[in-house]
Amino acid sequence: MNYTRFISFTVLAAILSSCEFNEDFCIRNGELVAWCDFSGIRETPPVPEERHIIAFPSGMDIPSGEQMTFTQDTLRQSIPQGEYQFLFYTGNYEVSDIRDYHEARLMARTDTLEGEVYISGVQKFCCSAGFSQRLEYQRPKRVPITPSAFVQRLNIQINVSGNITPLAGLQGTLTGISTGRYLVSRERTGNASVTSLFSRKPETDRWKTSLYAFGFNPAAENILSVKIEMDGKDSVFNEEQKVDLTPYLRGFDSDELSLELDLHIGKELTIGEPVVIPDWEDIPETELPNYN
């Protein structure tokens, strides 16, 4: 008889059987069953692969900040039983300080060009939520998640007049954009600029753009630089004008803001003061130009 294997099996059996009598002796898993209620969200719900939950255990000797990603509309995850605080967010964002419940924050990707920091690409809509739950062995906990918007949307419409025939495009660059936001406190951090292309609504002289951002840095100015791009030989007349949006964006804490400006192309490029507009209509995707 192999006494070494017999003794090992006996010890293992004793350990396994002891779990039936001593809850502190071994780790038992509880099950979290979570799904999202997006009824309060106007935007299209994100695909399952863009939904994430971060788990923060309380009083347990297991790592904090473990992230779970939805691969279906409902998340079913087996993790050690106990008290947890959970943070939920959507989108493909970097999470900084993911191990710290209060310091965890989403970060937008940035690039530095000639010493200036810019948001990379286009930020997408993002929503978030937080909840607490105690998970117990063999008692699945079913939790509906009701997120709220975690980004702000800024819409800008420019009404162009004057010498518009050679106008090929409008580009805007806005300063004072927050690059990160804490998931718990929702405070904003960082400072960068973002560049956005305007699209012309067919058969009109109205050019529109929309952008999502974590918010606007309260210590920075929000200067919008509008650059006109002319066709062909008229490109020598490409110009840029600036307008201060700080009075509208500083302290702005709602989900969405829409502004309208007048731009006149003549001997000089002139831009008017912004006006807040109550309703915003997106240009349908079928009417957007194809830049490919």
Tell me what each language-model feature is.
Residues 116-208:
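A sequence/structural signal for flexible, mid-protein segments enriched
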Residues 23-42, 146-161:
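A short, Gly/Thr-enriched small/hydrophobic beta-strand-prone motif that recurs across taxa
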Residues 15-18:
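C-terminal motif of bacterial Sec signal peptides marking the signal peptidase cleavage site
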Residues 52-100, 167-248:
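Tryptophan-paired
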Residues 42-49, 162-168:
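A short beta-turn/strand-edge loop motif at beta-sheet boundaries
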Residues 225-292:
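Hydrophilic extracytoplasmic domains
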Residues 1-7:
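Bacterial N-terminal signal peptides that target proteins for export
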Residues 63-149:
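Short, low-hydrophobicity acidic/polar segments
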